[in-house]
Curated annotation (Swiss-Prot):
Family of this protein: Belongs to the fibrillar collagen family.
Pro residues biased stretches: 152-164, 785-795, 829-844, 961-976
Residues annotated with 4-hydroxyproline modification: 20, 23, 26, 35, 38, 41, 55, 70, 76, 85, 91, 118, 132, 153, 162, 165, 192, 195, 207, 213, 222, 228, 231, 246, 255, 258, 266, 275, 290, 296, 304, 310, 328, 337, 343, 349, 358, 361, 370, 379, 385, 397, 406, 415, 418, 436, 453, 459, 465, 471, 477, 483, 495, 504, 517, 523, 532, 550, 565, 571, 592, 598, 601, 610, 616, 634, 643, 652, 664, 670, 679, 688, 691, 718, 726, 735, 753, 762, 765, 771, 786, 792, 798, 806, 812, 832, 835, 838, 907, 910, 928, 943, 949, 964, 967, 970, 973, 976
Regions of compositional bias (Low complexity) in chain numbering: 108-118, 132-150, 198-237, 352-378, 387-406, 465-474, 577-591, 604-631, 660-676, 723-735, 864-878, 910-943
Predominant localisation class: secreted
InterPro entries per the UniProt record, alphabetical: Collagen, Collagen_superfamily
Note: These protein fragments were extracted from an ancient mandible bone collected in Haiti.
Species for this entry: Acratocnus ye (Hispaniolan ground sloth)
Protein name, entry field: Collagen alpha-1(I) chain
Gly residues: bias regions: 294-308
Keyword tags: Extinct organism protein, Extracellular matrix, Glycoprotein, Hydroxylation, Phosphoprotein, Secreted
GO BP term, pick one: extracellular matrix organization
An annotated Gene Ontology molecular function: extracellular matrix structural constituent conferring tensile strength
UniProt note on tissues of expression: Expressed in bones.
Length: 976
């Protein structure tokens, strides 16, 4: 050494591995501050849809809805059983003399004439319609067909326009204290510093006596940061040190600064999860109003009733002109019909007859095939913000975001309390074993002497480990030392005990610039099933579904009240014989004419999609047969009404009641079916005579030829009932208790990255960003080809002008088309730049967006917090369309069946209406039908659990090298 200056020699070998030190004393616990303002919502992408939650509990019985509208006219019902013969009516008055009768019947065919010469070939074309054949016997009911396969899914509807941004929500109530989060993910290991120059190996000296500890020297000036060195080999892991005891609870700290309430950008729509389990069967709905009477069924024709008393013969009218006799022979031309006679006047209406017994219900019809699924509706406007949901189970952490640029250095904070002792660091490599020194007695620590004038010598060889000294008392916490250099990252320790929930700190300054977003990560693992959320508000009514296919024939409903007479329709063609109207005065018995041919069937209506088959209901018990009631007295004869216009071709209605209604008799057993009587002889219609006794009902004549189809008459007036107003919503139920925590799901396989989605609609203009820092002028790149013209975006607010750059003014270039956004370039191979001068601290910016959530540690999830308060009820949505008809309610013991509605006859004298019969037993419920078309989009549901983390994003560009930190405090002396 020259002039007393020691020259450092080469660095010696590393010493042996040191023993783990004793656990440090626990530091005092920090003060718990008041809870801070709620932070702004995150802006990360919405995760995939979580697994379906457990089936919810059955809701309370809803209020009885408004009676539904009458359904579509059902298919023709089966022909009922033959009714019992009616009682003999009273003799009617003698009818008046009738008008001229119709043409006489066609004469018998004469003998066959000689065979004629072959005629000329007639024009080609369709021949006349032949007469319908006799009705065959009804076939046995076939088995129900198998349920058809579900139709293909309908095409996806067009995406709706972007919704308007919702209003800023009100400040939410402070939620319950959530469970402590698990340990965060292990950070990226920092690069080790460059190795120092190796000193010269000096001779191993004898261990000297323990010197007095020197005084703490002044902090040296920060040195120049060296170039980053290569990473060294990872050393072996040291033993885990024991955890220190928890410190005392500190006082409450100062309240944190309020967080920003700016609303985050909406994330993309998550992937639709698997369908949830089928819910439990709902409550039986209120019974709807009876539907209109169905068309007549295809059953067999009933037998004739009992023959009535013959009426008095009327005065014979003049005989009508005889028709032309047909030409003899099969090939002869058909004779032309004679002229039609004048129709007779309408007779007086007779008394109302007794009501016949109802027929037994027929078999159910088959279920129709399912209709095609409708197109998806367009999304509706955003609904009101829902109530705050309960705290869900801790989700998986999201993907790590791109590294941002370093922020401005903040002011030096107030020294905090010392933290808990951290895990032991990595052990260094074992050095050469030094010579063992003599074990001296453990001396007591002396007072600190003054600092010596010499420089710090080279470290001597490590001596043998001495005896552990007595643990000293805890000293007063000193001032916070300057931050030392970052050490190597230790092994990940075991999760410690759950600490006290600390107050949220104040929002930090926002970074000067935000890095470019990383690439979309692959979908992560599926998170555990969350707890079932509270019952949401009532959703908007869905759109009216398509009309369902006619379901199975249900039990006949009760006979509704007689509606008001409809307006007179246009005179139509002659239709088939309707049901017998009120008996008029008996006229002279005329000869029955030929029955007209039945008209062609009307056009079939549009087939709706199949309705949902109901669950089979319980079969009711048969009712007791009652005794037959006595016939009531005849009512007074009404005045003769003017002949009304011929009505449209109506469905055969029920048999009209005869005579005024007496007390209702019990339903008797169906009688045996009678045989069809032969047709009566053909006679001329006489004028109506005076009213005679009421005759018994004669047998029906043979079926005539089908007549031309009648025209459809005008629709009848609406019923007298008023449209009811929708019922008010019931009171909101109390929030349910949180369910038990679900078990953790198995770890899913990471799926492959999905295809890139189509470009969405242009978003709404975002808020103006802060002016960015002035960056260095980049080198001019080559001009790329013009990209395709994109759709015009919405005009955003004008941004603040940035500072003017130092570049020279260039020549004006041509306006190029905007090119597509290029991929992020790789980091260039250039050397790191020289450290820049420390910048002046900038103003505190707004609070930055919440960072991505860290990975979940191995610790168990904490207990679920208490349920949050239920939010206020949302606005009442529009009235929904009529829902599907609920299950058929249980019927009473007895009930009459309603007949088929026939065309209105001439007005008779109104009889007294008897009370309705008791309800009969319920029929079996039909099978469930296929689902109807989807309804409108409901309100936004509660947010689902946080999805699994995506893959790690690309590493951001390296930021500029910061200024070197001050040197750290000297370490504790090694063992003697």
């Amino acid at each position: 050494s020259a002039g007393g200056i020691s020259v450092p020699g080469p660095m010696g070998p590393s010493g042996p591995r040191g023993l783990p030190g004793p656990p440090g004393a626990p530091g005092p616990q920090g003060f718990q501050g008041p809870p801070g303002e709620p932070g702004e919502p995150g802006s990360g992408p919405m995760g995939p849809r979580g697994p379906p939650g457990p089936p919810g509990k059955n809701g309370d019985d809803g209020e009885a809805g408004k009676p539904g509208r009458p359904g579509e006219r059902g298919p023709p019902g089966p022909q009922g059983a033959r009714g019992l013969p009616g009682t003999a009516g009273l003799p009617g008055m003698k009818g008046h003399r009738g008008f001229s009768g119709l043409d006489g019947a066609k004469g018998d065919a004469g003998p066959a004439g000689p065979k004629g010469a072959p005629g000329q070939m007639g024009p080609r074309g369709p021949g006349e319609r032949g007469r319908p054949g006799a009705s065959g016997p009804a076939g046995a009911r076939g088995n129900d067909g198998a349920t058809g396969a579900a139709g293909p899914p309908g095409p996806t509807g067009p995406a709706g326009p972007p919704g308007f941004p919702g209003a800023v929500g009100a400040k939410g109530e402070a939620g319950p204290q959530g469970a402590r989060g698990s340990e965060g993910p292990q950070g990226v290991r920092g690069e080790p510093g460059p190795p120092g120059p190796a000193g010269a190996a000096g001779p191993a000296g004898n261990p000297g006596a323990d010197g007095q500890p020197g005084a703490k020297g002044a902090n040296g000036a920060p040195g120049i940061a060296g170039a980053p060195g290569f990473p060294g080999a990872r050393g072996p892991s040291g033993p885990q040190g024991p955890s220190g005891p928890p410190g005392p609870k500190g006082n409450s700290g100062e309240p944190g600064a309020p967080g920003s309430k700016a609303k985050g950008e909406p994330g993309p729509t998550g992937i639709q999860g698997p369908p949830g389990p089928a819910g439990e069967e709902g409550k039986r709905g209120a019974r709807g109003e009876p539907g209109p009477t169905g068309l007549p069924g295809p059953g067999e024709r009933g037998g004739p009733g009992s023959r009535g008393f013959p009426g008095a013969d009327g005065v014979a009218g003049p005989k009508g002109p005889a028709g032309e006799r047909g030409s003899p022979g099969p090939a002869g031309p058909k004779g032309s019909p004679g002229e039609a006679g004048r129709p007779g006047e309408a007779g007086l209406p007779g008394a109302k007859g007794l009501t016949g017994s109802p027929g037994s219900p027929g078999p159910d019809g088959k279920t129709g095939p399912p209709g095609p699924a409708g197109q998806d509706g367009r999304p509706g406007p955003p609904g009101p913000p829902g109530a705050r949901g309960q705290a869900g189970v801790m989700g998986f952490p999201g993907p790590k975001g791109a590294a941002g640029e370093p922020g401005k250095a903040g002011e030096r904070g107030v020294p905090g309390p010392p933290g808990a002792v951290g895990p032991a660091g990595k052990d260094g490599e074992a050095g050469a074993q030094g010579p063992p020194g003599p074990a001296g007695p453990a001396g007591e620590r002396g007072e600190q002497g003054p600092a010596g004038p010499g420089f710090q010598g080279l470290p001597g060889p490590a001596g043998p480990p001495g005896e552990a000294g007595k643990p000293g008392e805890q000293g007063v916490p000193g001032d916070l030392g300057a931050p030392g250099p970052s050490g190597a990252r230790g092994e990940r320790g075991f999760p410690g005990e759950r600490g006290v929930q600390g107050p949220p700190g104040p929002a930090g300054p926002r970074g000067s610039s935000q890095g470019a977003p990383g690439l979309q990560g692959m979908p992560g693992e599926r998170g555990a099933a969350g707890l079932p959320g509270p019952k949401g508000d009532r959703g908007d009514a869905g759109p009216k579904g398509a009309d369902g296919a006619p379901g199975k024939d249900g039990v006949r409903g009760l006979t509704g009240p007689i509606g008001p007479p409809g307006p007179a329709g246009a005179p139509g063609d002659k239709g088939e014989s309707g049901p017998s109207g009120p008996a008029g005065p008996t006229g002279a018995r005329g000869a029955p004419g030929d029955r007209g041919e039945p008209g062609p069937p009307g056009p079939a209506g549009f087939a709706g999609p199949p309705g949902a088959d109901g669950q089979p209901g319980a079969k009711g018990e048969p009712g007791d047969a009652g005794a037959k009631g006595d016939a009531g007295p005849p009512g007074p004869a009404g005045p003769t009404g003017a002949p009304g216009p011929i009505g449209n071709l109506g469905a055969p209605g029920p048999k009209g009641a005869r005579g005024s209604a007496g007390p209702p008799g019990a339903t008797g057993f169906p009688g045996a079916a009678g045989r069809v009587g032969p047709p009566g002889p053909s006679g001329n219609a006489g004028p109506p005579g005076p009213p005679g006794p009421v005759g018994k009902e004669g047998g029906k004549g043979p079926r005539g030829e089908t007549g031309p189809a009648g025209e459809v008459g005008p629709p009848g007036p609406p019923g007298p009932g008023e449209k009811g107003s929708p019922g008010a919503d019931g009171p909101a139920g109390a929030p349910g208790t949180p369910g038990p925590q679900g078990i953790s799901g198995q770890r899913g396989v990471v799926g492959l990255p999905g295809q890139r989605g189509e470009r969405g609609f242009p978003g709404l203009p975002g808020p103006s960003g802060e002016p960015g820092k002035q960056g260095p002028s980049g080198s001019s790149g080559e001009r790329g080809p013009p990209g395709p013209m994109g759709p015009p975006g919405l005009a955003g607010p004008p941004g603040e002008s940035g500072r003017e750059g130092p570049g020279a003014e260039g020549s004006p270039g041509r306006d190029g088309s905007p090119g597509p956004k290029g991929d992020r370039g790789e980091t260039g191979p250039g050397p790191p730049g020289a450290p820049g001068a420390p910048g002046a601290p900038g103003p505190v910016g707004p609070a930055g967006k919440s960072g991505d959530r860290g990975e979940t540690g191995p610790g168990p999830a904490g207990p679920a917090g208490p349920a949050g308060a239920r939010g206020p009820a949302g606005p009442q949505g529009p009235r929904g369309d009529k829902g599907e008809t609920g299950e058929q309610g249980d019927r009473g013991i007895k009930r009459g069946f309603s007949g088929l509605q026939g065309p209105a006859g001439p007005p008779g004298s109104p009889g007294e209406q008897g009370p309705s019969g008791a309800s009969g037993p319920a029929g079996p419920r039909g099978p469930p039908g296929s689902a109807g078309s989807p309804g409108k989009d409901g309100l936004n549901g509660l947010p689902g659990p946080i999805g699994p983390p995506g893959p790690r994003g690309r590493t951001g560009d390296a930021g500029p090298v910061g200024p070197p930190g001050p040197p750290g405090p000297p370490g504790p002396p090694g063992p003697p």
